[in-house]
Regions:
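Active-site-adjacent loop/helix micro-motif of nuclease/hydrolase catalytic cores
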Residues: 69-81
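Intrinsically disordered, low-complexity terminal regions enriched in charged/polar residues
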Residues: 106-143
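A structural signal for short, well-ordered beta-strand segments and their strand-loop junctions
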Residues: 33, 62-64, 94-98
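Short amphipathic alpha-helical segments and helix-helix/interface helices
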Residues: 24, 81-85
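Acidic-basic catalytic patches of nuclease active cores, encompassing PD-(D/E)XK
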Residues: 1-45
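Conserved catalytic cores of phosphodiester-cleaving nucleases, focusing on short active-site segments
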Residues: 27, 54-70
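Nucleic-acid nuclease catalytic cores
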Residues: 85-113
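Charged, often glycine-rich, active-site loop that binds/positions anionic groups
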Residues: 41-55
């Protein structure tokens, strides 16, 4: 069973762990943990700006970490992108993308991420939340 096929309750327990570990291993700058990591509160009750607090703080900017897998599609929720724009008013924002299927990573500025979102289709998760479906070819230039 692929990660995407597992029930959400199972996926949420490890969601982001692999990608965050890769960021910590591969970062060339000093960082500190910054964002919320599965806190024991109702996240849906929080405003998006708090819900999507970037994962790491560096002297160069805030870093949100997100992974993609076998389907080779980075799924960026619309409200997450808006929250990251809000954070960018305080400190530059970057997205560290880790592809666990091909063991590769990329660091995108918020400007680059926004451009790729505009070039991508909008789809929806089963619960109805819209997201930008960014194909890996828009990140790494592969076919």
């Amino acid at each position: 069973m692929s990660f995407a096929e597992k029930p959400f309750g199972v996926r949420i327990r490890t969601m982001g762990d692999i990608a965050e570990r890769k960021f910590e291993e591969r970062s060339v700058v000093d960082w500190v943990r910054y964002g919320l990591c599965r806190p024991p509160i109702d996240m849906s009750a929080l405003p998006p700006e708090l819900r999507y607090t970037p994962d790491y703080l560096t002297a160069q900017g805030l870093v949100e970490v997100q992974g993609l897998g076998q389907d080779q599609t980075l799924k960026v929720k619309h409200d997450k992108l808006e929250a990251l724009r809000w954070w960018s008013k305080i400190h530059p924002v970057f997205l560290f993308v880790y592809d666990s299927h091909k063991d590769r990573h990329s660091l995108l500025s918020l400007e680059d991420l926004t451009k790729r979102c505009k070039e991508s289709d909008t789809q929806s998760f089963p619960e109805g939340k819209p997201y930008f479906a960014i194909k890996s070819s828009l990140i790494w230039g592969d076919v």
